[in-house]
């Protein structure tokens, strides 16, 4: 076998391989012997068909199969010999085959980039220092009450947290536009669902009033014909409702799994859940800074084949989220996913190098702790832990999570890490 390697462009490689004629012929003869043992031809007993008849009938297809197999095997031998690490599927470029002559073909592919980690000691990470305060628990309890609130009609003017039922008609330069009209439209104030100025124009009005508000569509508005345009909306305010919050009764508290129905029990349960969320948020915040610093400090070429593969993964995930099928997934424009896919490939390659250079392996104690932490959010944690322990795929996924955490910790060990006091709400809003 003769092998030559050339760089086509960037990470592109072209390996040219020549297979000796006698290697091909020996492989063909060997395969024809195997075929002769199995075939049945009228007039001959099984395994007793003369080789010239076997060769006449099956020679062409056997030769084609043998060539394909030899091309694959010689390519593998070549990249092992040349210490090449292909990224993505190779593209075989067969040469012209002539019986009794050496056969030359080429294989084109991309290779993984050579990564030499640098700048780890210059990465700056700010670790949030947070604790869940009584005031944070109070705020969360108020949120829970709001989520369980009922709506009660009121006679007064619209406030910031009320709910209104309206009819509206919008116009630009005196002309109504598509999507600018609705009847019995229910709008919860303060959620930012409408364009800027719309809700502000409703505040202070009472049910039964009809009025006109002036607004301007944002420059980034999705409808091209409305971007930056001044508009008028005629509003008919039909109903105003205010929240009626439930009291912290025993019945209300038991809805959240607090068996004794006490306020103290609810506060303890809420605090426990908030502290679990907080732990994850701090971990994610630190991790994102470490990875961002790693990426900025290490610019690498990325194989297009890996980006294409990651785009397919993201397409399928998007289709699943929105109830689509695989065909619909492949029709989604690659531009929607290209930047995210490239980022994920870069991060994967860099963390992979961190793992390799630090000779990291998944810590089974960490894997166990991660599973137990995740399971603690469920009603029966032991059942979840057992389910994971019996599922190899889930366990492997969790080992990958643990290994990634260990890689991030290896980066943090060399980075400049400082601490910054912050509040629960501030940190959680950063995660949103």
Swiss-Prot record:
State the organism of origin.
Klebsiella pneumoniae subsp. pneumoniae (strain ATCC 700721 / MGH 78578)
Q: Kindly state which keywords UniProt assigns to this record, in alphabetical order.
A: Cell cycle, Cell division, Chaperone, Cytoplasm, Isomerase, Rotamase
| UniProt enzyme class | isomerase
Principal place of residence:
cytoplasm
EC number(s)?
A: 5.2.1.8
Function, in words: Involved in protein export. Acts as a chaperone by maintaining the newly synthesized protein in an open conformation. Functions as a peptidyl-prolyl cis-trans isomerase.
Q: Where is the signal peptide, in residue numbers? A: none
| Residue ranges occupied by any PPIase FKBP-type domain in the UniProt entry | 161-246
Q: Which GO terms describe its cellular component?
A: cytoplasm
An example GO biological process term is: protein transport
The answer to whether UniProt assigns keyword Chaperone to this entry is: yes
Where in or outside the cell it occurs: the entry states:
Cytoplasm
Q: Which family does it belong to?
A: Belongs to the FKBP-type PPIase family. Tig subfamily.
Q: Which reaction does it catalyse?
A: [protein]-peptidylproline (omega=180) = [protein]-peptidylproline (omega=0)
GO-annotated molecular function: peptidyl-prolyl cis-trans isomerase activity; protein folding chaperone; ribosome binding
Written domain comment of the UniProt record: Consists of 3 domains; the N-terminus binds the ribosome, the middle domain has PPIase activity, while the C-terminus has intrinsic chaperone activity on its own.
A Pfam entry, by short name: Trigger_C
What is the protein name for this chain?
Trigger factor
């Amino acid at each position: 076998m003769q092998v030559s390697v050339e760089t086509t462009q960037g990470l592109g490689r072209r390996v040219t391989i020549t297979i000796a004629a006698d290697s091909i012929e020996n492989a063909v003869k060997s395969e024809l012997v195997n075929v002769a043992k199995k075939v049945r031809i009228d007039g001959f007993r099984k395994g007793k068909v003369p080789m010239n008849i076997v060769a006449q009938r099956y020679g062409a297809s056997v030769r084609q199969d043998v060539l394909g197999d030899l091309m694959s095997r010689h390519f593998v031998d070549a990249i092992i010999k040349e210490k090449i690490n292909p990224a993505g599927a190779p593209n075989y470029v067969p040469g012209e085959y002539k019986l009794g002559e050496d056969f030359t073909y080429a294989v084109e592919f991309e290779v993984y980039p050579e990564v030499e980690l640098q700048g780890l000691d210059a990465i700056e990470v700010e670790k949030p220092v947070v604790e869940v305060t009584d005031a944070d628990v109070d705020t969360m309890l108020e949120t829970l009450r709001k989520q369980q609130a009922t709506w009660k009609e009121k006679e007064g003017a619209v406030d910031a947290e009320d709910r209104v039922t309206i009819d509206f008609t919008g116009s630009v330069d005196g002309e109504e536009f598509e999507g600018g009209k609705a009847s019995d439209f229910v709008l919860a104030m303060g959620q930012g669902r409408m364009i800027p100025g719309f809700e502000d124009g409703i505040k202070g009005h009472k049910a039964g009033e009809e009025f006109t508000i002036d607004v301007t569509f944002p420059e980034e508005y999705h409808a091209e014909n409305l971007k930056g345009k001044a508009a008028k909306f005629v509003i008919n305010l039909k109903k105003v409702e205010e929240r009626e919050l439930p009291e912290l009764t025993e019945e209300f508290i038991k809805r959240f799994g607090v068996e004794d129905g006490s306020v103290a029990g609810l506060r303890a349960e809420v605090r426990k859940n908030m502290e679990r969320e907080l732990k994850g948020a701090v971990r994610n915040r630190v991790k994102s800074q470490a990875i961002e610093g790693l990426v900025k400090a290490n610019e690498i070429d990325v194989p297009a084949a890996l980006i294409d593969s990651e785009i397919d993964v993201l397409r399928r995930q998007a289709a699943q989220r929105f109830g689509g099928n695989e065909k619909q997934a492949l029709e989604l424009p690659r531009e929607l996913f290209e930047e995210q896919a490239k980022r994920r490939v870069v991060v994967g390659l860099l963390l992979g190098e961190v793992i390799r250079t630090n000779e990291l392996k998944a810590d089974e104690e960490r894997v166990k702790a991660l599973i137990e932490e995740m399971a603690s959010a469920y009603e029966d944690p032991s059942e979840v832990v057992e389910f994971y322990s019996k599922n190899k795929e889930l366990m492997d996924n969790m080992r990958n999570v643990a290994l990634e955490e260990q890689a991030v910790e290896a980066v943090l060990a060399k980075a400049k890490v400082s601490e910054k006091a912050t509040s629960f709400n501030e940190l959680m809003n950063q995660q949103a």
